[in-house]
Curated annotation (Swiss-Prot):
rRNA processing is among the record's keywords: yes
Enzyme class, first EC level, given as a word: transferase
Organism: Mycobacterium sp. (strain KMS)
Binding site for phosphate: 88, 126-128
GO MF annotations in UniProt: 3'-5'-RNA exonuclease activity; tRNA binding; tRNA nucleotidyltransferase activity
Reaction(s) this enzyme catalyzes, per UniProt: tRNA(n+1) + phosphate = tRNA(n) + a ribonucleoside 5'-diphosphate
Job of this protein: Phosphorolytic 3'-5' exoribonuclease that plays an important role in tRNA 3'-end maturation. Removes nucleotide residues following the 3'-CCA terminus of tRNAs; can also add nucleotides to the ends of RNA molecules by using nucleoside diphosphates as substrates, but this may not be physiologically important. Probably plays a role in initiation of 16S rRNA degradation (leading to ribosome degradation) during starvation.
Cross-referenced Pfam families: RNase_PH, RNase_PH_C
Enzyme Commission number: 2.7.7.56
Protein name: Ribonuclease PH
Amino acid sequence: MSRREDGRLDDELRPVRITRGFTSHPAGSVLVEFGETRVMCTASVTEGVPRWRKGTGQGWLTAEYAMLPAATHDRSDRESVKGRVGGRTQEISRLIGRSLRACIDLNALGENTIAIDCDVLQADGGTRTAAITGAYVALADAVTYLAAAEKLSDPRPLSCAIAAVSVGVVDGRVRVDLPYSEDSRAEVDMNVVATDTGTLVEIQGTGEGATFPRSTLDKLLDLALASCDQLFVVQREALDAPYPGALPEPTSPPKKAFGS
């Protein structure tokens, strides 16, 4: 099998690295790297929920995505300077929020909000899928923080892990984890969000330059799910280490041992 421009096989991910505790203030903070794509993902906990959620006893999770002006070769203006958030930014923000809400029991949060912020420091394709993969780890750390603060009605509100990856058809070949040089000329481009239980959260796929048959779709999904399995391993290895900061001290008195 011939190799790609960066030396990888068609079914090979770029080197993936997840660094927890990247910044010190949020409950969860992660730097995720897929090759040259680097995204900072944070999970901040705030008291209260949106107005339409008040009085339900349920929490909420929301997400925002943005790219730094110099994340790509050509600098782009900040959207705050333009005075409006672009359609692509809104779409990806909503995708990240939907993906992470699929794995958490919002009832367990009480009326608290977890705000996910994904900021692309450097873009080389696959920024939204890298953001989802890293944001899950930041979310897991935020849940650990909430548990230590005794704000969870269920100490284990996460039902599964979430990861995402890009797949596509480039030069007639099914490939995974497309860098910009491949993504920009792909005949088929797809993003897949999956759980570690083998189910799908979301599929975004388009024929950029041509239509494609069902058999190609099956190959793309098989490759995406196999690659997500590898990402789940990276996530678990990152989360095996202790929480990378100071946890709040419990406020309730310790329970007395039976018979004491």
